[in-house]
């Protein structure tokens, strides 16, 4: 975090008129993050003067940006973060091997920078004149769920969070329960001449279960009981270390895309409403 703080963010807002109206304006945002990396995101900001709550959305692995109706959530600032190398930041033809990049050392592993990007998103949202910094929230699915947990663990400015199907939890068991991302990570570690012990040592610095006891805000989590990508066992490895007010919702027939379950958006909205 000290290294991140030493990097001037150099926020740049680029208007997206085709996605704006007289209710909210849309912007593509660019900023500098850990290591001087340029990252970006999509911002919707109310046109009317005032102070507004803000919602940060952390994206799933390899997801594309999706554009909202600017008239939806007229009383909310919304920011969708694109972490390094993904979405807006992905180069044409770039492989989606991020989970294995830099595995040979904790200082070079991809998620070191990505977790810092998650905190930089909070920096950005809190820098906006219209943000009520006492009402900043976050949510995300899969990789975005992991980033939501990481952000709240590393930064106490978040008021409440709602991750679903969180990724990157309990690696030793995770790699037994699911083939991906274990297979490409293990292959990269082998190529780097690492033992399993060395690999898991590096990964322990980025295991979400080792972060969540630092969370200071309320949490609601959604899981899919049939999830083969981020199995419930791994979700609860992170959840069980949370010491604050917390709750979870299980969708027994859902696989990985639990965030698409009909009841989750309503449950999430009701949860955040308590803290608005």
Q: What is each of the regions a protein language model found here?
A:
Residues 236-276:
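C-terminal catalytic histidine-bearing segment of alpha/beta-hydrolase fold enzymes
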Residues 214-215, 221-223, 227:
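Short beta-strand/loop motif that positions the catalytic acidic residue
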Residues 100-142:
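Gly/Ser-rich "nucleophile elbow"/oxyanion-hole loop immediately N-terminal to the catalytic nucleophile
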Residues 149-194, 250:
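Hydrolase active-site cap/lid region
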Residues 225-230, 257-258:
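Acidic catalytic loop of the alpha/beta-hydrolase fold
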Residues 217, 231-240:
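Short alpha-helix in the alpha/beta-hydrolase fold that links the catalytic acid
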């Amino acid at each position: 975090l000290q290294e991140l703080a030493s990097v001037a963010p150099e926020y740049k807002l680029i208007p997206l008129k085709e996605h704006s109206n007289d209710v909210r304006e849309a912007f593509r945002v660019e900023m500098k993050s850990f290591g001087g990396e340029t990252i970006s995101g999509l911002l919707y900001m109310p046109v009317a003067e005032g102070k507004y709550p803000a919602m940060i959305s952390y994206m799933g692995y390899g997801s594309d940006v999706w554009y909202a109706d600017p008239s939806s959530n007229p009383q909310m600032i919304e920011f969708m973060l694109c972490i390094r190398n993904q979405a807006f930041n992905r180069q044409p033809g770039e492989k989606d091997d991020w989970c294995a990049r830099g595995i040979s050392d904790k200082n070079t592993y991809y998620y070191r920078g990505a977790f810092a990007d998650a905190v930089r998103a909070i920096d950005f949202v809190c820098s906006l004149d219209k943000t009520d910094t006492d009402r900043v929230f976050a949510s995300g699915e899969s990789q975005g769920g992991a980033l939501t947990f990481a952000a709240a663990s590393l930064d106490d400015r978040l008021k409440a969070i709602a991750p679903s199907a969180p990724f990157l939890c309990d690696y030793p068991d995770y790699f037994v329960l699911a083939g991906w991302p274990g297979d490409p990570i293990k292959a990269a570690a082998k190529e780097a001449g690492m033992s399993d012990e060395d690999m898991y040592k590096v990964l322990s610095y980025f295991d979400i279960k080792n972060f969540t006891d630092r969370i200071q805000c309320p949490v609601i989590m959604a899981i899919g009981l049939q999830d083969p990508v981020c199995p419930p066992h791994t979700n609860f490895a992170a959840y069980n270390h949370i010491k604050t007010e917390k709750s979870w919702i299980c969708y027994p027939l859902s696989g990985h895309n639990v965030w698409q379950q009909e009841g989750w958006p309503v449950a999430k909205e009701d949860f955040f409403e308590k803290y608005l």
